[in-house]
Amino acid sequence: METSSPALSVAIGVLAVLLGMTGFGVYQAFGPPSKALDDPFDDHED
């Protein structure tokens, strides 16, 4: 079995981190923690 190149390992690691951060952001925006978010447009009605 051939060993994979270090560049491929780094690329997969970076991809995993980016996907994790994206998933966490979507969870924060639309999941249960989103109930604690305030809408600044609702706070300052004209």
From Swiss-Prot:
Pfam families: PsbN. It is a single-pass membrane protein. The chain crosses the membrane at residues 7-27. Keywords: Membrane, Thylakoid, Transmembrane, Transmembrane helix. Signal peptide: none annotated. GO terms for cellular component: plasma membrane-derived thylakoid membrane. It is found in: Cellular thylakoid membrane. GO terms for biological process: photosynthesis. InterPro entries: PSII_PsbN (IPR003398). Coiled coil: none annotated. Disulfide bonds: none annotated. Belongs to the PsbN family. May play a role in photosystem I and II biogenesis. This is Protein PsbN. It comes from Parasynechococcus marenigrum (strain WH8102).
